[in-house]
A protein has these predicted regions:
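Short helix-coil boundary/hinge micro-motifs
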Residues: 1-270
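BZIP DNA-binding basic region
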Residues: 245-306
Length: 306
């Protein structure tokens, strides 16, 4: 996995501060704070750490942790890496501004197969609208007043308009959608781990359910090009952070050298040093053995007192 991305680059935008705001529709959204500053970074630089953090946010929900704990973890992830880019991840193309309408494959969040562009944009700009004019397949977008936003727009002029728009401070993503995506990734990981751990103890019908669940995991492969930097470098054209995480997670999921594992004690996702790694740390291993020993002793005491 490391070899695949060692000579690779990409880019995404994150802000230094995010907040959760409630819109007029009563829904909660994650959005940059009004004075937050953007930062352009390479998400492939620390890709294993990013995927692990995403999976562990999802595991908090799988393990039914309190909502305030989940909320804090989601905001922490977004501050580290930025929003997921759902606006460009969901349609059939990130260049949907070049078409008369937005076309959507089947997904968790939007039932419609197509939407008017203005209605679709409204899902991601619930507070302040961008100055966008849409007439048929023609689109224009005016950015003025905020020099930082103008500079950000100019930086990504060669990108699809919608991707560029999603880097603006006004952009927001529904909190429930973001949370669900993290949970979906954690579900995919646990499905894979349980399938192999329980293979001999489950029947064929259950195995088929696991296989179908895994078959549903996938995505559109991102495009790439080669840039001549200090040396030839693969540059991945991720039009959403979601797609980048999905691809990196996929490669990590099939990596035998450093397999993704769930800690037997704390349920934290970690990269194992070998296929049968069971604990994320020596501390967790020791605590697990202590609790296991105490459980045995209690059982023996009960038998002695019977």
């Amino acid at each position: 996995m490391n070899n695949l991305f060692a000579q690779s680059r990409s880019h995404w935008v994150r802000y230094d501060r995010y907040e959760i705001k409630t819109g007029k529709d009563g829904k909660r959204y994650i959005t940059p704070e009004k004075t937050a500053k953007p930062d352009i970074y390479n998400p492939l630089k620390d890709s294993p750490e990013m995927v692990l953090e995403a999976l562990n946010v999802g595991m908090l929900m799988m393990n039914r942790r309190p909502e305030d704990v989940v909320e804090k973890a989601i905001l922490s992830f977004v501050t580290h890496y930025g929003l997921l880019g759902l606006m460009t991840a969901l349609p059939t193309t990130p260049s949907f501004m070049d078409y008369e309408a937005v076309y959507l494959p089947k997904n968790h969040f939007i039932k419609e197969e197509s939407m008017a562009t203005e209605d679709y944009l409204a899902l991601f700009y619930p507070f302040d609208k961008l100055d966008v004019v849409k007439k048929g397949v023609e689109s224009s977008w005016n950015v003025s007043g905020d020099n930082m936003m103008i500079a950000l727009t100019m930086t990504f002029m060669d990108e699809p308009m919608a991707k560029n728009m999603s880097f603006q401070r006004e952009y927001a993503e529904p909190y429930d959608w973001v949370a669900q995506q993290f949970k979906d990734w954690a579900f995919t990981l646990t499905t894979s781990i349980l399938y192999y751990n329980d293979y001999d103890s489950i029947d064929e019908d259950t195995r088929n359910l696991y296989r179908k669940a895994m078959a549903a995991f996938g995505g559109i492969a991102p495009s790439y090009h080669i840039e001549l930097l200090e040396k030839p470098t693969i540059y991945w054209d991720f039009h959403s952070l979601l797609l980048g995480i999905q691809m990196m997670f996929s490669f990590m999921l099939v990596d035998d050298a450093k397999p993704l594992r769930l800690c037997k004690h704390c349920q934290k996702v970690f990269l194992g040093s070998r296929a049968n790694s069971a604990f994320c740390s020596a501390r967790c291993k020791n605590q697990y053995n202590v609790y296991k020993s105490r459980g045995k002793n209690k059982g023996q005491d009960g038998e002695d007192n019977a």
